[in-house]
Amino acid sequence: MQQDPPTSQPHTPQIVDGVKPRGWVDHPAGLHFEYLGIADSRPTRTEYNECWAHQREVHAEVSAHQRPNTVIYVEHDPVYTAGRRTRKEAYPFDGTPVVPVDRGGEITWHGPGQLVGYPIVFLQRGIGVVDYVRRVEEAVIRLVSQYGLRAGRVPGRTGVWFPSDGMGPERKVCAIGIRVSRQTAMHGFALNIDPDTAGFDNIIPCGISDADVTSMARELRRLHGPDAEVPSLLEVAGNLEPILTEMMSFQPYEMSPDIPRREHPAFLHPMP
């Protein structure tokens, strides 16, 4: 997570004597959803830098109250993004592009089979960064529960996880990294639906070495066998819309319970 420090100058147009500037949009006014490529008759992937430039344009408009809160849905070409805490020695050497970005967190992978969502949302007064992140997590937790999957938060860790069990350690299904500037969030979440998770093998995802990465497809197959039905990115994105809309209304909500931390034997007794 990354939050820019306040400055002495106002970042957005101001209401003077009750008169709003031309083009002013009150927040929240619901959420507007943009589907980049994934809703096409022949779905296409979007290059990361192209989408990042679009994010910045949308962020400028939302923070200036010239556009409603917007969620950008996208599936990226293979790429690593390195948050501000990433050390150079953590970069992979497999030839996949690495893009340094201005969000919090460390390095992660994006690619085919992963739904990436960028909520560009003006944070109401009193809504802090942690509260915002918890709301994004809650939306994903509720989403995967619609498919019979029990996920949750792990204390001290960001994102959405499946608990440690006899088959392995805690497994992250959704990574979250944001930046807040001009009271408006950008960047967002990456939900693994059915990616080739080998892309994570060349890095320590988000700098966490004692956990694993999973996907909705992998968890569904664990429950129902190899022929389990796996939803498409478009289906998941559509089902997530009303949940995100509810969470981004910033009304009180009941938070899902945390997953208890349990050390897996593989990390209690490492190989010599």
From Swiss-Prot:
GO terms for cellular component: cytoplasm. It is found in: Cytoplasm. Residues 65-255 form the BPL/LPL catalytic domain. The record marks K172 as: Lowers pKa of active site Cys. The active site is at C206 (acyl-thioester intermediate). GO terms for molecular function: lipoyl(octanoyl) transferase activity. InterPro entries: aa-tRNA-synth_II/BPL/LPL (IPR045864), BPL_LPL_catalytic (IPR004143), Octanoyltransferase (IPR000544), Octanoyltransferase_CS (IPR020605). The keyword NAD does not apply. It is an enzyme of class 2 (transferase). Substrate binds at R103, G104, G105, E106, I107, T108, W109, H110, A175, I176, G177, G188, F189, A190. Pathway: Protein modification; protein lipoylation via endogenous pathway; protein N(6)-(lipoyl)lysine from octanoyl-[acyl-carrier-protein]: step 1/2. Keywords: Acyltransferase, Cytoplasm, Transferase. It catalyses: octanoyl-[ACP] + L-lysyl-[protein] = N(6)-octanoyl-L-lysyl-[protein] + holo-[ACP] + H(+). Gene3D superfamilies: Bira Bifunctional Protein, Domain 2. GO terms for biological process: protein modification process. Its EC number is 2.3.1.181. It comes from the Bacteria. Residues 1-20 are annotated as: Disordered. Catalyzes the transfer of endogenously produced octanoic acid from octanoyl-acyl-carrier-protein onto the lipoyl domains of lipoate-dependent enzymes. Lipoyl-ACP can also act as a substrate although octanoyl-ACP is likely to be the physiological substrate. Belongs to the LipB family. This is Octanoyltransferase. It comes from Cutibacterium acnes (strain DSM 16379 / KPA171202). The lineage of its organism: Bacteria, Bacillati, Actinomycetota, Actinomycetes, Propionibacteriales.
